């Protein structure tokens, strides 16, 4: 499809123009529903996506960089101040990131319970305020109580996850009237800003640890949440969203995710991200055994983030049209051998190749990160186009929550594997076996690629039109009603507009 997905003005067919209330009534009677097409007046076309919204979403994208800035400080704090072992560290890191695994809860709340008539603004202010409060407290208290430290970290990750829900909803809303290329550009730019902040913060995280204390880094990290908090006051958003009952919302969510293409994406994302990893265990090996300095670790993380950034830009420019099955298959096949490369350092084979440990680890992590980013971007782009209007936070957060929940499962499996192999902060005898096991489990997602749609299966999604339509109109009575909306819109429905026009290119 060469024309924009939502622009079909040049078609010869007649459209019946009606209000959103009429559409809702029509849907309740007629099971052969058609997809809604919204034609926004030119003079208001820029209103939902004003520059302030773009600045806000960009700052939210960069907010996760604060986590990267403080990540080494957090790990060293738990490792040195509280003397946690690798398995215990993995469990603590899992616990404090639980808010990210249940982002769906925050999304449902923000979609259904607007604060003072706004679904985005005040939730963003609340989340950024919690980030500011927790980071300032972490920078001021004396760290001699593990419970208080974990609680403050938990509050920070809760605030950042809430901000992230709002930022992702803004990105999805900006994709509402875009072609597949524009959607790929919007999503790619959002994550490119995130990875760029990762690269900057990764370098600073190691460099600053050599100059200042961990508590000072927490205080410095509060600057970006302050910027996000300030930007929240300038968000352009329509008011008068009515409250929807949680029961009705859950019914709608359940009916939406029963659609095969959404359900299969959730299953595949979970399988792909739930395999065990040896990342935290390798951290203990390279710090305790290889004596890597914090500055070097920061540089490694910086190169890793730069690789992700370049990968995202490359995907945006060259790979948006590649079939998702082929992309995931080839990337998995390519990345699997690189997962075994740490064995070369552990067995000291690299000395025979005259490659130092530092260069070897940096090269390995950069290559893995570059290829791995190709596995996530097409899924994120496609998911952002499958989401019905009014469910921007809920469904996108559901899809990404499966990613975060799978990461927690991965951490628990990694902890269990670390414990069963008797790997400690000083005993790395069985580390090669753990690396091999983790590498083999990376192949598992290949066997589930068949559940994802390919180009030849696009037309098979057309039967989902009648099921999807009512969720496109579910919140529209109050969201785009001519009586309650701040913008002037014309709502139309088209009998020949197909589901693949908005989901797959």
Swiss-Prot record:
Catalysed reaction(s) here are: folate(in) + H(+)(in) = folate(out) + H(+)(out)
Which cysteines share a disulfide bond?
none
Q: Name one GO molecular function term.
A: folic acid transmembrane transporter activity
Q: How is its activity regulated?
A: Transport of folates is inhibited by probenecid and methotrexate.
> Is Translocase found in the keyword set?
no
Signal sequence, renumbered to the chain = none
Q: What is its main location?
A: membrane
The record's listing under Gene3D superfamilies reads: MFS general substrate transporter like domains
The alphabetized UniProt keywords are:
Cell membrane, Glycoprotein, Membrane, Transmembrane, Transmembrane helix, Transport
- GO CC annotation: what is one? plasma membrane
Function, as annotated, reads: Folate transporter with broad substrate specificity. Transports folic acid, folinic acid, pteroic acid, dihydropteroic acid, the folate precursor p-amino benzoic acid (pABA) and the human folate catabolite pABA monoglutamate.
In the record, the note on similarity to other proteins reads: Belongs to the major facilitator superfamily. Folate-biopterin transporter (TC 2.A.71) family.
Where are glycans found on this sequence?
A: 177, 181, 186, 240, 427, 454
Q: What is the membrane topology here?
A: Multi-pass membrane protein
Q: Name where it's found.
A: Cell membrane
Does Transmembrane helix show up as a keyword for this record? yes
> Where are the bilayer-spanning segments?
58-78, 89-109, 122-142, 146-166, 192-212, 216-236, 266-286, 300-320, 326-346, 352-372, 405-425, 431-451
Task: Supply the InterPro entries for this chain.
Answer: BT1, MFS_trans_sf
List the Pfam families hit by this protein, alphabetically. BT1
* Record protein name field: Folate transporter 1
